[in-house]
């Protein structure tokens, strides 16, 4: 009822819109502003043609792990195109839609990052104007006429400046030319000379390797204006989704057709403002002016290539584009980080910093100062920019400052190192590697090479490649499955340390961190002295040289050594007084009270050196989040499974946590869901986490205290969530029965809110009685929930298709194949485990129903075909013929039906397939001679066709390939007659 009313209301709005005189989109003299161009597009489709205005989706894809960023206007509507939209959702009611979508193309399949700045058109962020018609609301004629009306009558583009293209067809796939679209353009008055046809590469759009697709028509603008040869740029692409690309490459017609159009706002504005470059429009000119005013560089002049002396204009374009991308992404919740989309954004920011400082000589804080200009130009269309402007500027400025500091330190290291080099010496690879380490200075290697090039020094690239390979091998060795190559102190080394009187390592500084009111953690540095050094082979040495991997013993450290299931810290150390040279620390191991740091020495290091240690904040925070989450998970399991539930082990790193629990069976779907809800409740309350060392004997007073079968130090550290440790130790306290209280030496959050969320993504039984759970937290957990929701919608859509019934076998097989694909996705996707179990149960039931439907259709088809064959072969003991069959299963059923209705007849049928293969099935009569077997009969025929056969004395089947079916049928008849 609601959908019908909405459709009626839409028709009424469109009728009113057509009856009202259309107002020009700009009454002001001069070229239109970019904002007016955007507004005119949206209002044209909304007010005149009854489209629903849908806000832009965030650039962070929702429930689509295949994308780093939203890179096209159609991304948010993929559930409609794929038929997976939730029928209860608002999107299910979309019929005709218009919007302006924020898009980012940097990383992944569509990556324009390295092209930005080099020419006058590429952008990492752009706006895609689009209108859509779903389910056949309208199609080619209306889409083309509306586009032509908007461009020529509203925007006022001269018709003689516009060219169009259409799909010329494809002989390989059997697709005919899209003459319908051609004729539409001709009927709209486009001269035949400006209506061009192209093949599938230019004018056939596909979503991916499989999925909806169809011919498209492009509208091009002639920059030359009829003077000389045309200079065409694509303006608008109108896609007519009417096909579906199957996994085998074949095309099927879609049950519902859709229109998907896209026109880049930046290019459209350039055309309407009479500019050759998008950077010359008012979408960018405020930014370019602000850059000029802040940097004092020569004004932007639009030069490229060799004409752009000093790469000044290139830098202008890079900075203007990248600050837009950064602002939009951060406003949408994507911040610079260390993996995935955040890592790409970090590259974008550092690329902008490089050009602004190295080329434009911009002052510190420059990039952050441009954020208000971005808000001014885009904020009216995307209010989230203004809402988050302070956050955006702060994050940009912080990362800019961090990178500038890294650059300054890097330059000093390079200067000092270069002074030591001879005239023909190469720059040491180990120093360059130290500069480029992710998480420390983080200077891209190409920038290191550029800085060296400016000094006339070449980098030891061969050595750098060796270090990269060595580091990759070492990281692989650090994996859980391969631990044997780690530096470690054996019993002899420990004895020697004791003999020399070297004290064990004081690692209490690892707990030296604070939580600020804004939610940020601060980790203090640690001053220490080198007490002992070990070579890569484990031999004690007095010093190590440049490029050597080594082990260090210090008198004290703030690094957490791997223990208690928590991965060790990473970071770096510097010699006191020589802050510029970083010694990367890959990990720390606890060996008999001594903490051995695994490091790479970029230059000489010796016993007695004073050093300062810095932990990798992001890595440490990741471990703290996962460790606190592990405690909450342990408590939630006890709340769900009972107070006697025991932990049997755990391991965590910044990416995920693993938890082994004693259970006789795997957790049920409801238990998994309950465990997560307990954790979410505590996280949502942002409870404080208390940590305190107490005498080991006192911990015996705590009823319900969680501890493992380990030897604990005395005093021991108690970690309590929401309840002060002193209160938990009280004689009458029941705190540990109602919250998480554990003995633990790990590093933890100071409040639970930073966990964000927890999702159990995997469950398996290690051995009888022990279940292993895998879990993730924070944004990863939220993403898993989004993917799970998206997959659930796809399964619901498949269920709906199954309920509607299949008209024919091909459709039934497609549905069965789709259910099989969903089953595979549900098995491997990173989604909540409880949801995986629910989906697998549903999909198993759907697959059974789909198979039943296929068997029913096959039986009906077999009955029909067998009756036709009996009419044609009413006499004689033999039926040898061809028949169309969708599969070998159908062909076998036809043969059996024939023999059931005529037991005295022997039957062999061949069925040619579109792929060129030939299916074969046969059955001999009940009274056939003992020498006449179905298997031998099928083998004789299939061998003739260059194939194979299998079966029994009574029934057999096979496959082959032949261009001469009559010859194959002749072979079948001759063999059978020889046996009768």
UniProtKB/Swiss-Prot annotation:
Its main location: mitochondrion. Its cofactor is Zn(2+). This is Alanine--tRNA ligase, mitochondrial. Monomer. Belongs to the class-II aminoacyl-tRNA synthetase family. It is an enzyme of class 6 (ligase). SMART domains: tRNA_SAD (SM00863). It is found in: Mitochondrion. It comes from Mus musculus (Mouse). It comes from the Eukaryota. PANTHER family: ALANINE--TRNA LIGASE, MITOCHONDRIAL, ALANYL-TRNA SYNTHETASE. Its EC number is 6.1.1.7, 6.-.-.-. Signal peptide: none annotated. Binds 1 zinc ion per subunit. Pfam families: tRNA-synt_2c (PF01411), tRNA_SAD (PF07973).
């Amino acid at each position: 009822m609601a959908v019908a009313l909405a459709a009626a209301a839409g028709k009424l709005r469109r009728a009113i819109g057509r009856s009202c005189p259309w107002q020009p989109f700009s009454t002001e003299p001069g070229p239109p502003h970019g904002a007016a161009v955007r507004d005119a597009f949206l209002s044209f489709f909304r007010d005149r043609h009854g489209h629903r205005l849908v806000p832009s989706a965030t650039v962070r894809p929702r429930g689509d792990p295949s994308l780093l960023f939203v890179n096209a206007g159609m991304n948010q509507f993929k559930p409609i195109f794929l038929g997976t939209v939730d029928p209860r959702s608002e999107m299910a009611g979309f019929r005709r839609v218009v919007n302006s979508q924020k898009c980012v193309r940097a990383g992944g399949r569509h990556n324009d990052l390295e092209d930005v700045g080099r020419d006058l058109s590429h952008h990492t962020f752009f706006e895609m104007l689009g209108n859509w018609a779903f389910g056949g609301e309208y199609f080619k004629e209306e889409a083309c006429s509306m586009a032509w009306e908007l461009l020529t009558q509203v925007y006022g583009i001269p018709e003689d400046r516009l060219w169009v293209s259409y799909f010329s067809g494809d002989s390989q796939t059997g697709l005919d030319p899209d003459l319908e679209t051609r004729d539409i353009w001709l009927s709209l008055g486009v001269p035949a000379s400006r209506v061009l046809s192209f093949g599938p590469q230019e004018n056939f759009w596909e979503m991916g390797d499989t999925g909806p697709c169809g011919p498209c028509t492009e509208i091009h603008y002639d920059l030359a204006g009829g003077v000389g040869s045309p200079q065409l740029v694509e303006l608008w692409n109108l896609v007519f989704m009417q096909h579906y690309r199957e996994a085998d490459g074949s095309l099927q017609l879609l049950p519902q057709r859709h229109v998907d159009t896209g026109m880049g706002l930046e290019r459209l504005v350039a055309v309407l403002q009479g500019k050759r470059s998008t950077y010359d429009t008012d979408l960018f000119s405020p930014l370019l002016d602000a850059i000029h005013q802040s940097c004092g560089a020569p004004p932007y002049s639009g030069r490229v290539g060799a004409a752009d002396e000093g790469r000044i204009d290139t830098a202008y374009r890079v900075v203007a584009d990248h600050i837009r991308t950064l602002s939009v992404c951060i406003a949408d919740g994507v911040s610079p980080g260390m993996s995935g989309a955040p890592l790409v954004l970090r590259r974008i920011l550092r690329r902008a910093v490089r050009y602004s400082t190295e080329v434009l000589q911009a002052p510190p804080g420059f990039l952050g100062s441009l954020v208000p200009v971005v808000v001014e130009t885009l904020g009216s269309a995307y209010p989230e920019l203004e809402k988050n402007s302070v956050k955006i500027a702060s994050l940009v400025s912080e990362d800019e400052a961090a990178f500038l500091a890294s650059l300054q330190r890097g330059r000093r290291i390079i200067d000092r190192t270069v002074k030591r080099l001879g005239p023909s010496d190469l720059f040491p690879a180990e120093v360059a590697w130290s500069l480029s380490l992710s998480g420390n200075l983080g200077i891209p290697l190409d920038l290191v090479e550029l800085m060296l090039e400016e000094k006339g020094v070449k980098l030891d690239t061969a050595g750098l490649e060796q270090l990269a390979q060595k580091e990759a091998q070492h990281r692989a060795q650090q994996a859980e499955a391969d631990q044997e190559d780690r530096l470690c102190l054996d019993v002899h080394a420990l004895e020697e340390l004791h003999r020399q009187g070297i004290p064990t390592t004081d690692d209490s500084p690892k707990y030296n961190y604070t939580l600020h009111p804004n939610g940020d953690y601060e980790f203090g540095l640690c001053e220490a002295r080198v007490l002992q050094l070990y070579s890569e082979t484990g031999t004690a040495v007095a010093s190590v040289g440049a490029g050597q991997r080594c082990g260090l013993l210090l008198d004290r450290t703030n690094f957490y050594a791997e223990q208690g299931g928590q991965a060790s810290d990473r970071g770096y150390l510097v010699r006191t007084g020589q802050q510029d040279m970083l010694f990367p620390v890959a990990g720390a191991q606890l060996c008999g009270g001594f903490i051995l740091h695994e490091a790479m020495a970029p230059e000489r290091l010796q016993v007695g050196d004073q050093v300062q240690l810095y932990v990798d904040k992001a890595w440490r925070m990741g471990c703290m989040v996962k460790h606190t989450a592990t405690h909450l998970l342990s408590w939630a399991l006890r709340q769900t499974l009972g107070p006697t539930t025991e932990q049997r082990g755990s391991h965590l790193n910044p990416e995920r946590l693993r938890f082994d629990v004693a259970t006789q069976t795997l957790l049920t779907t409801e238990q998994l869901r309950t465990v997560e809800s307990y954790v979410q409740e505590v996280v949502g309350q942002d409870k404080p986490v208390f940590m305190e060392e107490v005498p080991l004997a006192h911990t015996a007073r705590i009823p319900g205290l969680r501890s493992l079968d380990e030897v604990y130090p005395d005093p021991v550290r108690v970690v309590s969530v929401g309840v002060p440790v002193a209160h938990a130790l009280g004689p009458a306290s029941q705190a540990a029965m109602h919250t998480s209280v554990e003995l633990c030496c790990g590093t933890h959050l100071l409040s639970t809110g930073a966990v964000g969320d927890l999702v159990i993504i995997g469950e398996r039984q290690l051995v009888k009685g022990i279940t292993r759970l895998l879990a993730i937290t924070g944004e990863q957990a939220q993403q898993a929930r989004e993917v799970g929701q998206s997959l659930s919608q796809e399964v619901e859509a498949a269920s709906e298709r199954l309920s509607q019934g299949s008209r024919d076998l091909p459709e039934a097989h497609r549905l069965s194949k789709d259910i099989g694909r969903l089953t595979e996705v549900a098995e491997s996707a990173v989604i909540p485990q409880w949801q995986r179990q629910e989906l697998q149960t549903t999909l198993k039931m759907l697959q059974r129903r789909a198979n039943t439907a296929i068997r029913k259709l096959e039986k009906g088809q077999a009955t029909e075909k067998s009756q036709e064959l009996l009419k044609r072969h009413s006499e004689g003991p033999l039926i040898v013929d061809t028949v169309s069959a969708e599969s070998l299963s159908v062909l076998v059923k036809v043969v059996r039906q024939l023999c059931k209705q005529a037991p005295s007849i022997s039957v062999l049928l061949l069925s040619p397939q579109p792929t060129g293969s030939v299916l074969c099935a046969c059955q001999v009569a009940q009274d056939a001679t003992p020498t006449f077997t179905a298997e031998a009969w099928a083998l004789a025929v299939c061998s003739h066709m260059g194939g194979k056969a299998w079966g029994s004395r009574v029934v057999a089947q096979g496959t082959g390939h032949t261009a001469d079916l009559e010859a194959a049928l002749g072979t079948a008849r001759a063999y059978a007659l020889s046996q009768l």
